[in-house]
From Swiss-Prot:
Top-level class of the enzyme under EC nomenclature: lyase
An example Gene Ontology molecular-function term: aspartate 1-decarboxylase activity
Name of the protein in question: Aspartate 1-decarboxylase
Organism this protein belongs to: Bordetella avium (strain 197N)
Record-annotated active site: S25, Y58
Purpose of the protein: Catalyzes the pyruvoyl-dependent decarboxylation of aspartate to produce beta-alanine.
Modified positions (Pyruvic acid (Ser)) in chain numbering: S25
UniProt GO BP: alanine biosynthetic process; pantothenate biosynthetic process
Keyword annotations from UniProtKB, A to Z: Autocatalytic cleavage, Cytoplasm, Decarboxylase, Lyase, Pantothenate biosynthesis, Pyruvate, Schiff base, Zymogen
Record gene name: panD
Length: 122
C-alpha cells in the first residue's frame, strides 16, 4: 500500500506579489525551492495563515535570492501581498518508507530568506 505523506514545507513565507492576470501558478524563489527540495511544475498545497484559505496550484521558479512568493491567476484571489503562507508538497511512499520518513521544514525570516532547515518533528 502507498501512503501520501508530507514531503516538505515552506513555513510562514510572506506573499510578495499577486497577479490575477498571469496564467496561473505560484512563483517561488529558487533558493527556497532548493532548500525544500521542491521542483518547478510540482503540485503544491498552500495554506493562508492570515485568512484561513487553502488551495493548490503548481510551482514556477522565481529569481534566486529575490525572496519572491508570487500568486498568479486564480490563486491571486486567495491571498494578498503581506499574507503569511505555508506551502507544502506531498508524495507517495511505501509502508516501509512512511514508517521512518521525516518531512523537511524550511523556516524563513521576514524577507523570505532561509533561516533554518530541519526535519519534522524537531
Amino acid at each position: 500500500m502507498q501512503r501520501i505523506m508530507l514531503r516538505a514545507k515552506l513555513h510562514r513565507v510572506t506573499v510578495t506579489e499577486a497577479d490575477l492576470h498571469y496564467e496561473g501558478s505560484c512563483g517561488i524563489d529558487e533558493d527556497l525551492l532548493d532548500a525544500a527540495g521542491m521542483r518547478e511544475f510540482e503540485r503544491i498545497e498552500l495554506y493562508n495563515v492570515t485568512n484561513g484559505e487553502r488551495f493548490d496550484t503548481y510551482i514556477i521558479k522565481a529569481a534566486r535570492g529575490s525572496g519572491a512568493i508570487s500568486l498568479n491567476g486564480a490563486a491571486a484571489r486567495r491571498a494578498q501581498v503581506g499574507d503569511l503562507m505555508i506551502i507544502c508538497t506531498y508524495g507517495p511512499m511505501s509502508e516501509e518508507e512512511s514508517a521512518t520518513h521525516k518531512p523537511k521544514v524550511v523556516l524563513v525570516d521576514d524577507a523570505n530568506r532561509v533561516k533554518e532547515i530541519r526535519k519534522f518533528p524537531a
